[in-house]
Design a protein with these regions (language model features):
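ATP-dependent carboxylate/acyl-activation modules
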Residues: 1-187, 192-254
């Protein structure tokens, strides 16, 4: 989806078995690969869902260790989410890790870019402990994204020269994706500066507004029920709103 909107990403392939993971690594070539558990949650790296490996044998071992298991992160339910597939991509040389996201500010009715030079980390913790590291630029829907918005973000992230142009292209692609795909959140963490000075999205998360799924047929076809809470899924099929919580104490308020 990112590639469709002109946002550079590492080349890679999805694999459902360790053998497919090995085949993916060989097709990509190189000397370093990253094996990523495909679950609908952030925080995979800290939970062991992202492995950097330097041999095809280790690609197979990493995939075998993930597939069929459940991954538990701060963003999953207590029992974690099943790992049915892994993504094998070419390793990238990372000079800097940045953060970039796009969401709606419901208070102002504007679309907000949130960025930080502290990428690759828990952004909520960064915002709580060092709010000065968070950059916010809001875009009025009537005027749309302007070059000044992009430059303010790029300079705030410490980008220079050609990197600013690359970033503007990424920001414009992100903004277009956000609008056309009816997103409630698009997050890149990390957005990296590569060894040759390029800018690339290394990992991402996209949330689609559920009330708009009726006009997002292609994205709806990608939905994976195994990554959803079963009770929430059943309630949704009955057109009911239900939020699954841990524990056995509840409060009903009218």
């Amino acid at each position: 989806l990112f590639a469709r909107y002109g946002i550079p990403v590492p080349a890679g392939h999805v694999a459902s078995t360790p053998e497919e993971a090995v085949d993916a690594a060989r097709r990509r070539g190189g000397a370093v690969w990253v094996v990523k558990a495909q679950v609908h949650a952030g925080g995979r790296g800290k939970a062991g869902g992202v492995k950097v490996v330097k041999s095809v044998a280790d690609v197979k071992s990493a995939a075998a260790g993930m597939l069929g298991q459940r991954l538990k992160t701060k963003q999953t339910v207590a029992e974690g989410l099943p790992i049915n597939q892994v993504y094998v991509e070419t390793g990238s040389k990372i000079e800097r890790e940045l953060y970039l996201s796009l969401l709606l500010n419901r208070d102002t009715g504007r679309i907000a870019f949130v960025a930080s030079q502290a990428g690759g980390m828990d952004i909520e913790a960064v915002a709580a402990k060092t709010p000065g590291k968070i950059i916010r630029v809001e875009v009025h829907p009537a005027t749309g994204l302007q070059g000044s918005h992009c430059r303010a973000l790029a300079f705030g992230l410490g980008l220079k020269g050609e990197q600013v142009k690359q970033f503007e292209s990424i920001a414009r692609g992100l903004y277009k994706l956000y609008l056309e795909c009816d997103c409630s959140l698009v997050e890149i963490n990390p957005l990296i500066v590569t060894g040759d000075g390029g800018v690339m999205a290394l990992d991402a998360k996209i949330n689609i507004e559920e009330n708009a799924l009726f006009r997002q047929k292609e994205l709806l076809a990608w939905r994976d029920p195994s990554q959803e809470d079963e009770m929430e899924r059943i309630a949704g099929e009955a057109d009911l709103n239900y939020v699954s919580l841990d524990g056995d104490i509840a409060c009903m308020v009218n």
